Every structure is written in structure tokens, then in C-alpha cells.
Amino acid sequence: DGTTNLDVVDIDGAVDMASTLQVDGAITSSAGATISTADNTDTLQLISTDADANIGPNLRLYRNSSSPADSDTIGVIDFEGRNDNSQDIIAARINVLVDDVSDGTEDATLFINTMLAGTVSSRIKMTPTETVLNDDSKDLDFRVETNGVTDALFVDGGNNNVQIGTGADFVTNTAGTSNFRAG
């Protein structure tokens, strides 16, 4: 039937399989792993069939350093693709660094970055003391919607204005001079 049962297999070289590999235990790789597919199906699935209310499935990015230090980057998720010149690009990146590794006072910063005009740029930065949008000072607008108002809060990145309400009902210049309009 083509089935072979082995208790221990030690392979020094490559294994090429054209079928399904069933592993009922843990998989440990010391040199990394690459999972690829030639179609648009899910490349990796983490499935939990547990019926309780606890979290799961879990994806853990674990930086197990023997000498952790302040400002260590502990994990990065890159969303990569190709441009029209067949070059690999990072379209978006999420990364975390630990600002303070002191026991009991640990702090971390989360960055969310996207590609903007050929450069990966900061969109959201969450530090231990603040949340910053557009930390790289790009000409980007920021908008908050309500159920009935498209521009309930609008920050005009190119003109350095903050608007509250629809359009320009209330405008304040962020350079120090405040312009107020009631509409």
C-alpha cells in the first residue's frame, strides 16, 4: 500500500514530497522554514478546534535573547510583493521594539508603516507615552467619520489645518494662529 512506519528517521539531505505530510507531534526547525504555494490558497493556517472561551489559535513571535537590551526589536511582520520592475518591495510593515526591558517596568513601542512614494513610512506609532499618526511628517490627511458626518475630525496634512465638522465648519491653524469659523 506504499505505507512505511518508522520510529526514527535521520535524513541528511533534502526530502521532496509530492503528497501530504502528516505530523502528529511538534515540528522543530533550527535553520528556518519556507512555506510556498503556486496558487491563491491559504499558505499557512493556524486552526484551533478547542471549544472553550480561551484564546486560540495563537501566533507567537518570541525573541528569546540571552542578553535583552533596551531598544531591541523583538518582532517584524513584512507584507512583501513585487513592483512593475520585478523588484521585491515591502508594502507594509508592523514591528515592535522594547523600550525598557527592566523587570516590572517593561515598555514597548508598536510601529505600523506603509509604502509611500517608494519609501516605507510611519503611519501609526504607539509608544509608552503617546500614540502618533504620521510621525514622518508626510503630506497625509487624517479623517475621523461618524455615522452621519464624513469629516467629523479632519487634519489637512498639506495645509496644517484641523477641521471639526463637515468641510470647513471649524478650522484651526496648527502653526499657532487659530482661525475659527462657525457654519
Identify the residue ranges that each predicted region occupies.
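Amphipathic hydrophobic-ligand
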Residues: 86-93
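Intrinsic low-complexity, repeat-rich intrinsically disordered segments enriched
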Residues: 1-72, 80, 85, 98-100, ...
